[in-house]
């Protein structure tokens, strides 16, 4: 077993060897290096053909038509293009947007920007399970609501939102529905037709493809219009200008092809490892799973646990041979408790003591068992150092204590 152990697959994934090998054929002078927009010679034609193949591979995984896939630099850009693009195009119909407090920063900060431009945004509170209450969402809809944005799988707690039901409501009321599916494609079955989704963002690097490339599904029937946020040569049907990075697109296509082929065998294996990890922790004292564990409502690769009376940062330091995250990769650089966990109603202490384990293609049973052992030791050691743990063990109600300020 090689140390450190990587259990942060929700932050990024290594590129699959098969993907890297394929990408190498699209870079040098001996490979296909042309610009797909060069329509007058063989170099451009070959590049365009490679892009078409990848576009089809990506569309296949989500049940879309290849013409509905727009390439971007990643899911953050896709979220920006979807939300700003739809809001600006449809603003004559209304300026109200609905989203959820536990969305990714790429959605929340885009909505904040639109608020500065005069749009109004309703941020829904999730239930303690992490899931959206459909009735609350429906109640928030107004005559001037033009867009609803809800992620399919949460990046921190892995819960699967009821996208199909939300899609039905939006379709019936003719409201544009955007879904950030960065953490769901290739991990759960995704079919944009069945889900009634108008816009869907996804990435390559969460699915064993290269970083720096992503996509946005833009529904053709009923047709959804967007105002571009990057202008130039009119690439991607005018929605996203810029020379297409063929090697990255080919890599993403190959990664999606492999995911479609291997998902049925890969996900049950990953689920077994996740359950093994959970079973290793579940009998410990004061250990809480964040987000629902109900079957079908959580992605198989995610386990987010709070170890009470242990500070997340010191826990991370004690796990130097295990790569996990406290909060999400985008917020783990800050010392703020996770806003996702706070939105679930967790207090600061529990939010601070959370660790996200995310399992992937190359995780082994041996690594899981070693992780359980190391984490248990670290928790025991850190709790021994904690006066709060001693007080808790003595039966003192910590919430009733008046702490004095010095």
From Swiss-Prot:
GO terms for biological process: [2Fe-2S] cluster assembly. Keywords: 2Fe-2S, Cytoplasm, Iron, Iron-sulfur, Metal-binding, Pyridoxal phosphate, Transferase. It catalyses: (sulfur carrier)-H + L-cysteine = (sulfur carrier)-SH + L-alanine. Pyridoxal 5'-phosphate binds at residues 75-76, 155, 183, 203-205, 243. Its cofactor is pyridoxal 5'-phosphate. It is found in: Cytoplasm. It holds the Pfam family Aminotran_5. [2Fe-2S] cluster binds at residue 330. Pathway: Cofactor biosynthesis; iron-sulfur cluster biosynthesis. Its main location: cytoplasm. The modification N6-(pyridoxal phosphate)lysine is found at residue 206. Homodimer. Forms a heterotetramer with IscU, interacts with other sulfur acceptors. HAMAP family: Cys_desulf_IscS. Master enzyme that delivers sulfur to a number of partners involved in Fe-S cluster assembly, tRNA modification or cofactor biosynthesis. Catalyzes the removal of elemental sulfur atoms from cysteine to produce alanine. Functions as a sulfur delivery protein for Fe-S cluster synthesis onto IscU, an Fe-S scaffold assembly protein, as well as other S acceptor proteins. Belongs to the class-V pyridoxal-phosphate-dependent aminotransferase family. NifS/IscS subfamily. This is Cysteine desulfurase IscS. The gene is iscS.
């Amino acid at each position: 077993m090689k140390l450190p152990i990587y259990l942060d697959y929700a932050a990024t994934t290594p590129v699959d060897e098969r993907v890297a090998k394929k990408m190498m054929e699209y870079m040098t002078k001996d490979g296909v290096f042309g610009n797909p927009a060069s329509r007058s010679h063989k170099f451009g034609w070959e590049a365009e053909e490679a892009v078409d193949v990848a576009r089809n591979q990506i569309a296949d995984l989500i049940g879309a038509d290849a013409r509905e896939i727009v390439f971007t630099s990643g899911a953050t850009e896709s979220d920006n293009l979807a939300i700003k693009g739809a809001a600006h195009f449809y603003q004559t119909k209304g300026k109200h947007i609905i989203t959820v407090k536990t969305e990714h920063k790429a959605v929340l900060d885009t909505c904040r920007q639109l608020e500065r431009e005069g749009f109004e945004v309703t941020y829904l509170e999730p239930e303690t399970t992490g899931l959206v209450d459909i009735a609350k969402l429906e109640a928030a809809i107004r005559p001037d609501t033009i867009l609803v944005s809800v992620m399919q799988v949460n990046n921190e707690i892995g819960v699967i939102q009821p996208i199909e039901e939300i899609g039905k409501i939006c379709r019936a009321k003719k409201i544009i529905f955007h879904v950030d599916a960065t953490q769901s494609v290739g991990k759960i079955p995704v079919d944009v037709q069945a889900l009634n989704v108008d816009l869907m963002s996804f990435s390559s690097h969460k699915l064993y493809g290269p970083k720096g490339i992503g996509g946005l599904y833009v529904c053709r029937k009923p047709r959804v219009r967007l105002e571009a946020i990057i202008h130039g040569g009119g690439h991607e049907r005018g929605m996203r200008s810029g020379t297409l990075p063929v090697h990255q697109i080919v890599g993403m296509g190959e990664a999606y092809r492999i995911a479609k082929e291997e998902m049925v065998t890969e996900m049950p294996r990953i689920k077994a490892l996740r359950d093994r990890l959970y079973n290793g922790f579940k009998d410990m004292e004061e250990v809480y799973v964040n987000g629902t564990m109900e079957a079908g409502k959580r992605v198989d690769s995610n386990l987010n646990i709070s170890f009470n009376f242990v500070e997340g940062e010191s826990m991370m330091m004690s796990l130097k041979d295990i790569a996990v995250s406290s909060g999400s990769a985008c917020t783990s650089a800050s010392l703020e408790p996770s806003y996702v966990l706070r939105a679930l109603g967790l207090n600061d202490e529990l939010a601070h003591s959370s660790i996200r384990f995310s399992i992937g293609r190359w995780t082994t049973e041996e690594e899981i068992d070693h992780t359980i052992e190391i984490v248990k030791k670290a928790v025991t050691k850190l709790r021994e150092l904690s006066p709060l743990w001693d007080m808790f063990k003595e039966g003192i109600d910590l919430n009733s204590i008046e702490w004095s300020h010095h």
